[in-house]
């Protein structure tokens, strides 16, 4: 262990980011308060075991505490809470911390169990027409992923993972936050989608945050809000909305629909359901494609696809009600089928231990067996 220079500041800052007291850290880790106070003012360093315990508690790589390298998204969370601190409750701050931890884990797992071939995608912006950037980037990504002009992909999460983005859905207390993008120093581009939104809105948010990852990659942190604050004045937000709209509802596709210039509420409902987008998103796309006049969309936007008719691409339709409920609960904590499968594959191939598997799945070892059962997986030591 090094001499603890800077380690105390890291501990104190993490504690402040997560709004926990020294007493709370002590109660959770078993490290006496007096010792923690000494570590924070750098009177002496923690032991090696204590560093591991603290790294586990704060959901970060223990090497971050003992080296000067940027191994944790520390500066990014510092920016996040300095700019938007009042928007994030204590619970939501822990949710963000766990999300960033899952991104680190997924990046590691993809290096040892590369189950998804990564597609190299770079988009170079030219000129200052922001809306044009969004449209061109959406068309470019669709081409790169091999979509025909008249084809639409239904699993936006899978598409985004193919280009190396870490996409996790997580329920946040603040329902006004639709999503956020973080540039992680080791995991790369990370997208969080608020699971408290409806299924269609989550798809749009995922594509919107992906646009920030692709087009605003000079930014360390971007938070998007449901109330659309600053959207009218913020060209980057307009660009991200354009990207999301044209990725999920490509102009080339809607122009190929029979009688593409004739729309009523029933037809909007039918195609919004087929394309898994809101009626509002579809009508915006129709206007942008020049198929419907903007002043004729008022009644079309108000149509609502019933929530029970909305399909989630990451929830198989053949699940029993009990299994579906359990999977939804896990999804709301960030545990997608893709990520869970990745974790278990690494475990089955001997890349990680059962203890590390539990840690990566945000459960203790006693809950691991139950989670394995929910996903039809096996634990070797349970045999």
Language model: regions and residue ranges:
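Active-site hotspot residues in diverse enzymes, especially metal/ion-binding acidic/histidine motifs
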Residues: 1-383
């Amino acid at each position: 262990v090094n001499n603890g220079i800077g380690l105390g500041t890291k501990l104190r800052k993490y504690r402040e980011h997560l709004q926990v007291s020294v007493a709370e850290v002590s109660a959770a880790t078993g490290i006496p308060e007096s010792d923690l106070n000494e570590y924070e003012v750098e009177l002496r360093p923690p032991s090696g075991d204590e560093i591991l315990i603290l790294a586990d508690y704060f959901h970060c790589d223990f090497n971050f505490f003992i080296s000067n390298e940027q191994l944790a998204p520390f500066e990014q969370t510092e920016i996040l809470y300095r700019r938007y601190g009042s928007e994030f409750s204590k619970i939501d701050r822990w949710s963000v911390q766990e999300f960033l931890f899952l991104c680190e884990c997924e990046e590691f797992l993809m290096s040892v169990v590369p189950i998804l071939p990564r597609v190299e995608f770079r988009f170079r912006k030219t000129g200052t027409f922001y809306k044009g950037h969004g449209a061109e980037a959406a068309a470019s990504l669709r081409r790169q992923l091999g979509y025909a002009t008249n084809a639409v992909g239904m699993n936006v999460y899978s598409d985004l993972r193919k280009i190396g983005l870490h996409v996790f859905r997580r329920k946040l207390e603040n329902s006004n936050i639709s999503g956020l993008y973080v540039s992680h120093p080791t995991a790369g581009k990370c997208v969080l989608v608020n699971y408290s939104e409806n299924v269609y809105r989550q798809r749009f948010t995922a594509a919107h945050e992906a646009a920030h990852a692709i087009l605003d990659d000079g930014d360390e942190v971007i938070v998007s809000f449901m109330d659309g604050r600053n959207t009218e004045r913020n060209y980057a937000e307009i660009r991200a909305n354009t990207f999301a709209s044209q990725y999920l509802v490509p102009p080339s596709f809607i122009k190929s629909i029979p009688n593409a210039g004739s729309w009523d509420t029933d037809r909007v409902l039918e195609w919004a359901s087929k394309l898994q987008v809101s009626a509002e998103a579809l009508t915006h796309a129709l206007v942008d494609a020049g198929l419907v006049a903007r002043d004729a969309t008022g009644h079309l936007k108000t149509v609502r696809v019933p929530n029970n008719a909305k399909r989630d691409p990451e929830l198989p339709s053949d699940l029993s009600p009990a299994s579906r409920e359990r999977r939804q609960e896990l999804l709301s904590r960030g545990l997608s089928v893709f990520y869970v499968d990745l974790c278990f594959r690494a475990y089955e191939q001997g890349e990680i231990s059962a203890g590390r598997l539990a840690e990566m799945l945000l459960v203790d070892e006693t809950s691991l067996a139950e989670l394995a059962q929910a996903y039809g997986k096996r634990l070797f030591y349970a045999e």
